[in-house]
Amino acid sequence: MARCRRRSGCTAGAALLLLLALALSGGGGAAPQGAEVTGLPGFDGALPSKHYAGYVTVDEGHGRNLFYYVVESERDPGKDPVVLWLNGGPGCSSFDGFVYEHGPFNFESGGSVKSLPKLHLNPYAWSKVSTMIYLDSPAGVGLSYSKNVSDYETGDLKTATDSHTFLLKWFQLYPEFLSNPFYIAGESYAGVYVPTLSHEVVKGIQGGAKPTINFKGYMVGNGVCDTIFDGNALVPFAHGMGLISDEIYQQASTSCHGNYWNATDGKCDTAISKIESLISGLNIYDILEPCYHSRSIKEVNLQNSKLPQSFKDLGTTNKPFPVRTRMLGRAWPLRAPVKAGRVPSWQEVASGVPCMSDEVATAWLDNAAVRSAIHAQSVSAIGPWLLCTDKLYFVHDAGSMIAYHKNLTSQGYRAIIFSGDHDMCVPFTGSEAWTKSLGYGVVDSWRPWITNGQVSGYTEGYEHGLTFATIKGAGHTVPEYKPQEAFAFYSRWLAGSKL
């Protein structure tokens, strides 16, 4: 019945039933009181669709609260898919996606480090065709927090459980979206978040958890998956991209026998060290983008961590306002892919990852008026917003994601694995290899996919609704580098069309 309020043409009987439901429930399917965002500092004019934001408490006893920001679809929010977006890290805020990738606005720097950015409508926002939920997860990330600091010791499985609890409570708050198709999407370390959360959602559906979520599938971009596939992807990628010579590649291939990330043989170790030195000057998030190299590296404090001053230089993307100077998701050094046990914070591995800064997002999200407008706790209450935090003690305890992908797709849940083909952080070579390893038959042979008459990448379709796709010229965060192409494959895939 809540659907009827979104569209004209309701029958008199339906309208009467709606009024009765509203009278009995005190609001029916409406969003929770006080959740609507009516305006945003830095943006002039009416919002292009309804926005909502706030907290969902996933543990009352500990006061563990997850922050969300919802952007209703600009097309038909009553029917369009609902998509939960998760950034990676672990420990990185999903406002990364909102500000720098596929949110409703393009952010233009205000001119100085702390000045309020100007917001302009993004013609390639994913909210053009879907309702987006941006979730900061787990607690301690972005604007999410807990009153019990022990909650900041967490891992894959606990994060998935909390995120599932969030979803069940969120759909209770927004029941008008229960019949919409629901998808989970993310990038980088969300290559772990997405399948583990999808597994929890499916398990909940099968176990009778209420409300019943209309889960249809998931999306993973340049995502972490498996220690062996991820760890061995970089050397073939570097060779294919012309970063290392045939001779160097053959030396590594012969001495390492394909096991590049866990070199134990002396000759293999020498070969890998040579490759590391050759690629060390590149922007790992997009090998085409520039990096600043200073003769003397100065150190700057960020919270309780130290980062080289060289992380402050500007790269370029296809965004109209090139305000992003930090490409941050998760940069795994060649010999340190995700494996069982504690995952180092991004600050601990950052010394090998140049080209970093996030002043625009920080200036906006730490502005008192913005915090008030989006119903977030103040800086004085929960601290400043950080793109990626180091307060978590995070454990990778879910193992390889291959079994998760196999289980989900074999049950009929659609999936697309997409990769920016110039990302050296999580190279497409690894994603393509593990996708093939699932053993599904090919139903749409490898071919280019087209946007505006131009090749935008390559794709291959498999049985059980599985699709693999590359995005030509894109880096680690695909919608940031190639917003138009990203919107094209996203909208086509959601609609069930071929890329």
UniProtKB/Swiss-Prot annotation:
The linker peptide is endoproteolytically excised during enzyme maturation. One of its GO terms (biological process) is proteolysis. Gene3D superfamilies: 3.40.50.12670, alpha/beta hydrolase. InterPro entries: AB_hydrolase_fold, Peptidase_S10, Ser_caboxypep_his_AS, Ser_caboxypep_ser_AS. The active site is at S188, D423, H476. Glycans are attached at N148, N262, N407. One of its GO terms (cellular component) is extracellular region. Residues 297-351 form a propeptide. One of its GO terms (molecular function) is acyltransferase activity, transferring groups other than amino-acyl groups. Disulfide bonds join C92-C388, C256-C268, C291-C355. It catalyses: Release of a C-terminal amino acid with broad specificity. A motif (Microbody targeting signal) lies at residues 497-499. It comes from the Eukaryota. Its EC number is 3.4.16.5. The keyword Glycoprotein applies. It is found in: Secreted. May be involved in the degradation of small peptides (2-5 residues) or in the degradation of storage proteins in the embryo. Belongs to the peptidase S10 family. Carboxypeptidase I is a dimer, where each monomer is composed of two chains linked by disulfide bonds. PANTHER family: SERINE CARBOXYPEPTIDASE-LIKE 20, SERINE PROTEASE FAMILY S10 SERINE CARBOXYPEPTIDASE. This is Serine carboxypeptidase 1. The lineage of its organism: Eukaryota, Viridiplantae, Streptophyta, Embryophyta, Tracheophyta.
